[in-house]
A protein has these predicted regions:
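Lipid deacylating catalytic domains
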Residues: 2-252
Length: 252
């Protein structure tokens, strides 16, 4: 992407979730553009790209593409830094992108480029976490750079909570089928509260600002209302746009 003129509002870079196509994020991107007044760029990721993240080199392969895009947007930002939004696994990947330490022979130091990281339904903790998620939790615990002396990052963790009962109309058949096992693997409680895939407890990150949204599912496959639904984007973006430091909750 060629460098353009300096923008009036800080740009936003969005990294979606595991195996979720770009078309799912169209309403989210459009809503953020309207609400923020700045450009919003969705990182292009193929199904193959996501499948390769089962291995460390697959994470590096994706972050190698995030880095130049983030740098170009930051160069045009009035503040010199951008907001990053990660949905599901995308939020975990972006936590790693912020780090200064070596990863697969690279150093990303993304915190020099991003001053805010918003994580939507990201599975930060789990009893049965994948090796890479466990590594991020171990090496970069909590809101790791929130209190850094230089280039601190504001972390905002957004969690959804749906009623799995069919009559509630919040959860799809897929969510009702998968949630008990997914919750058990994360917190040990199959009846936990969550977005149909990720329990609230797992989606909230120690040290991050917390936003819990009732009636919000993990994705379109898990319920009719999810983090990318325009009305829901308005709710979590209001928390991001407000002064840092507060927690929020509410119905979708």
């Amino acid at each position: 992407m060629a460098r353009g003129p300096t923008l009036r509002a800080s740009p936003i870079l969005v990294l979606g979730g595991f195996l979720i196509g770009a078309e799912a994020y169209g309403p989210l991107v459009a809503s953020l553009e309207r609400l923020s007044g700045g450009p919003v760029v969705l990182m292009p990721v193929s199904r193959l790209d996501w499948l390769l993240t089962l291995f460390p080199f697959g994470w590096a392969r994706l972050l190698d593409r995030v880095a130049p895009l983030a740098a170009e947007l930051a160069a045009r930002s009035p503040s010199g830094r951008i907001t990053m939004v990660g949905h599901s696994s995308g939020g975990i990947l972006l936590r790693l992108f912020l780090a200064d330490g070596p990863f697969e022979g690279r150093r990303y130091s993304g915190r020099c480029l991003a001053d805010t990281l918003v994580m939507l339904g990201s599975p930060h903790t789990a009893l049965k976490a994948t090796a890479m998620r466990a590594r991020v939790a171990r090496e970069l615990p909590g809101a790791f750079f929130a209190s850094a002396e230089s280039d601190p990052v504001r972390y905002v963790a957004v969690a959804g909570a749906i009623d799995l009962a069919e009559e509630a109309g919040q959860a799809s058949a897929t969510a009702r089928r998968l949630a008990p096992t997914a919750y058990r693997n994360s917190t040990g409680d199959p009846a936990d509260r969550g977005d149909g895939l990720v329990p609230v407890e797992s989606a909230l990150l120690e040290g991050a600002e917390a936003v819990v949204l009732e009636g919000v599912a993990h994705g379109g496959a898990f319920g009719p209302v999810w983090y990318g639904t325009p009305a829901v984007v308005e709710r979590w973006w209001a928390a991001v746009a407000s002064p840092a430091g507060g927690a929020a909750s509410g119905a979708a």
